[in-house]
Amino acid sequence: MSTGPGKKAIRNAGGVGGGAGPSAGGPRGPAGQAVKFARRTSSGRYVSLSREDIDMEGELAADYTNYTVQIPPTPDNQPMLNGAEPASVAMKAEEQYVSNSLFTGGFNSATRAHLMDKVIESSVSHPQMAGAKGSRCAMPACDGSAMRNERGEDVDPCECHFKICRDCYLDAQKDGCICPGCKEHYKIGEYADDDPHDGKLHLPGPGGGGNKSLLARNQNGEFDHNRWLFESSGTYGYGNAFWPKGGMYDDDLDDDVDKLGGDGGGGGGGGPLPEQKPFKPLTRKIPMPTSVISPYRIFIVIRMFVLLFYLTWRIRNPNMEALWLWGMSIVCELWFAFSWLLDMLPKVNPVNRSTDLAVLKEKFETPSPSNPHGRSDLPGLDVFVSTADPEKEPVLTTATTILSILAVDYPVEKLACYVSDDGGALLTFEAMAEAASFANVWVPFCKKHDIEPRNPDSYFSVKGDPTKGKRRNDFVKDRRRVKREFDEFKVRINGLPDSIRRRSDAFNAREDMKMLKHLRETGADPSEQPKVKKATWMADGSHWPGTWAASAPDHAKGNHAGILQVMLKPPSPDPLYGMHDDDQMIDFSDVDIRLPMLVYMSREKRPGYDHNKKAGAMNALVRCSAVMSNGPFMLNFDCDHYINNAQAVREAMCFFMDRGGERIAYIQFPQRFEGIDPSDRYANNNTVFFDGNMRALDGLQGPMYVGTGCMFRRFAVYGFDPPRTAEYTGWLFTKKKVTTFKDPESDTQTLKAEDFDAELTSHLVPRRFGNSSPFMASIPVAEFQARPLADHPAVLHGRPSGALTVPRPPLDPPTVAEAVSVISCWYEDKTEWGDRVGWIYGSVTEDVVTGYRMHNRGWRSVYCITKRDAFLGTAPINLTDRLHQVLRWATGSVEIFFSRNNAFLASRKLMLLQRISYLNVGIYPFTSIFLLVYCFIPALSLFSGFFIVQKLDIAFLCYLLTMTITLVALGILEVKWSGIELEDWWRNEQFWLISGTSAHLYAVVQGLLKVMAGIEISFTLTAKAAADDNEDIYADLYIVKWSSLLIPPITIGMVNIIAIAFAFARTIYSDNPRWGKFIGGGFFSFWVLAHLNPFAKGLMGRRGKTPTIVFVWSGLLSITVSLLWVAISPPEANSNGGARGGGFQFP
């Protein structure tokens, strides 16, 4: 079979496309269909060829040099698309051109492709990577790279093996298709006829498939929005070209489905029956043991009644001696009871879940009649990594995160990774290129030896025996080689800042010399020379289009063009094994060496446009990925979170692909952290929330979205409702009403726009999503590909098996140019991005708001806890940094409370207990007001000599004992069903008081200022520390950073200590000591101080050193106690030489 361009047959199913009817002329295919021939023009369009054109061998015009197959596949007519068939030369050239070009564009500027033969200064070997080494073009005066295939081997369009680059090859086509080497016509090979029964269903690409005309941006609004799949005869579903009503299936199919109890659904019960196999679920919901959860619920009810009786008793028995103290305490206790209810009620139904990866593999990656070659039928996945400042977020951390993603255990051809650099820094760009280069060694090594974790920095830092469980004889040799390569990689990364600076200084000096030379030649005055801009230069000797080290117009952090670079081009559809070469240090001959697609993106920023911080960057990633790869699912990470479990993605996919998966909007993984001090002084692990609260929400409508480590359904992010929605009506929203589509017939057809959103009409589509035809064409494709298999009658709106086994279309320049357009600063103007579509704007906690909107539309979410932690990240262990982090979260909660995202205003699609949990999110910061007052009440009691009750009678003590016992019992039971440690629970309680009296209080003040005075709130990016190998990883724990957030807890601690000393001295020297009230007030003061213990340790700095503050406190306390002693009981001796009554008497 020829590797050059050739003719391919284009078959059209009946009624689809021109000339497809039975009367159409021309030869017939094996299925009795008309056969047409087509050529692909230089503009990307497909033009039909007549029989006369085909017979004109050797006389084709330049446009006739590239042919491709365009077969509308159906179960009757399915193309042969195996990876052994080579792509056309021109297509390979376009792929190479895309991967070697840096695309820029944006506001009032044309999109440009800058061809880069050199991306980084180090050599590049992997054929998928931009700037990969290879032969040079043999044309005179041309220094371009010769065209290459997926192995990096030269592509020779002529038998004379003349090396030629893409541009020269296109020029040769225009000059009569004559090879510049042998001066003969390029020979056009013939492809064998395709097997019509390959068993694969073809899907158009994200930009409209083979219709390249859609890839050009439609500025005139000519796109037909009524055709974008949301129509009765769309592209997918039962009853169209991809799933015919008749033909190869029995006419009694619907009767069979009815007997099974199915009601159809766009490829669900109404489609063809799958192979008759016993249905195997991919997931299981495991309820908590009754012996644990039943007592837990009982104790909640008991404590509710105890609190009710206690508060009633307190209100009916005021302390008349100190009404002011009694009033303050009553108000605080009422709020605490209300807050406790909001926190505990959503915890009544925690669940566990499990997945079956073996069943997932059996369903989606095992050969079957619908998938004879065993290609992966799993949906695509786009992974997002966001970073903003390489100075605060070390590029080495970001690079190792990228490497862990590229090595994840998921079909390579279905995976794509996008890096959003909101700072537009060349340092981040070159670090990503270095990571792509190192992935050539790291990813095959991980696959060959089943490495965990797949972050190289973490893997080589793990203590223990690295050979445990390894059976291959060459593991030790391979590991030693990769370790050396990684050390060299780290050195290159660490040297990038200096390398970029030296390079830029050298080029800027050259430009200065050129300017001086020009001035001398023109005779101008050198003293009046114009100032040359100090640019930042790329490795190929051109200006970096992003942010420069010395800010300049169009090259600043808030003012630069959009940048897009395909670091690793999309892989070939079939496995590509390494070559057995003695020169290679590592043998990858039995390892698939393909790498997932990797894209660097920096969205355009201009003055006058609100960039909306991280939410805006995420929305730009959503649009960019939709145009380029359009994975129906998206996984987002912060740059400091990496994949710790290579199987985690598959476990999440089990939930999406199982029964009921079509109603799941996202899968949230728990956040786990490394580098936390062993005692977890400031509750950084937050296990009570991630293992307790989130697991409990999983038993309701689902966990909240918490910012990172979350896999989304793309269609849900677009603001659509789920296919089946439950409304909760009646008293306390307890009555569940399930609503489906209005028209029962729609379950056997492609879904319409009004099925998902009754308000969405064709003319409103651009207003909602923006004026990008390829983007809008990608939406229905993503919806279809995200459906679970229609292998069970309960699966509504499923898809047939084998529908996703075809390779994705290759990237071409118009597609990448459109991706640059959708990340421009003006694209979101007058659209619903950030309001209804994508990540929601207007809050510093955009993650919680985005998840809330999805739940409010009726979507569900799932909490996926894996045996091995799925993802690991870093967290600030310094006290001040931790408080600032909590301040940002709490400020976002206050914003939510005063916005239309308040759970009070939620729709009926939100469950009652889920509504309460979201209500608690907006209310919890206000607890800080009452907590601050309550922490001062013990001190005020000790100073005044009164207590919150008139006397410590038996009733008060019984209530206090009962509430304490129920609180401890609930804590123990919660520890048992959530799997956390009792120490973690206590640390959480301590930090609740610390943050409640500092960060939460400031958040309330800031939120009120924003709502009432319109004062905007700005937060600085939390710095991620990158410790050296020999540095103490806990060094930051002992650093004392002064902040105003520290003032309230310090004041509370000092006041309570002084109050205890004051009351103790007064009681001892009192004529009538009242020890009961002192013990009552002293007990609560000690309780407050016990909660502040981690805070005090944080102020004392490093262990083993006595900081100055200790001496200051000691001196202050000594002076205070001495003065109180003298003031209360002056040393006045009586005639017997004894002290006054009530004091000590020495012998």
Swiss-Prot record:
Which GO cellular component terms, listed alphabetically, does the Swiss-Prot or TrEMBL entry include?
Golgi membrane; plasma membrane
Look up keyword Cell wall biogenesis/degradation and say if it applies. yes
In which residue ranges is the amino acid composition biased (Gly residues)? 14-29, 262-272
Q: Which GO terms describe its molecular function?
A: cellulose synthase (UDP-forming) activity
Biological process GO terms, please? cell wall organization; cellulose biosynthetic process; plant-type primary cell wall biogenesis
Keywords noted in UniProt: Cell wall biogenesis/degradation, Glycosyltransferase, Golgi apparatus, Membrane, Transferase, Transmembrane, Transmembrane helix
Region entry Disordered, spans: 1-33, 259-281
Residue intervals passing through the bilayer = 292-312, 322-342, 929-949, 954-974, 1001-1021, 1045-1065, 1075-1095, 1108-1128
The UniProt entry, under Gene3D superfamilies, shows: Spore Coat Polysaccharide Biosynthesis Protein SpsA, Chain A (3.90.550.10), Zinc/RING finger domain, C3HC4 (zinc finger) (3.30.40.10)
Active-site annotation: D422, D847
Superkingdom as given in the UniProt entry = Eukaryota
Q: What is its EC number?
A: 2.4.1.-
Q: Where in the cell is it found?
A: Golgi apparatus membrane
Q: What is its main location?
A: Golgi
The record gives the membrane topology as: Multi-pass membrane protein
**One Pfam family matching this protein:** zf-RING_4
> What is the enzyme's main class?
transferase
As for family, the record states: Belongs to the glycosyltransferase 2 family. Plant cellulose synthase-like D subfamily.
Q: What does this protein do?
A: Thought to be a Golgi-localized beta-glycan synthase that polymerize the backbones of noncellulosic polysaccharides (hemicelluloses) of plant cell wall.
- Protein's name in the database: Cellulose synthase-like protein D3
Q: Which organism is it from?
A: Oryza sativa subsp. japonica
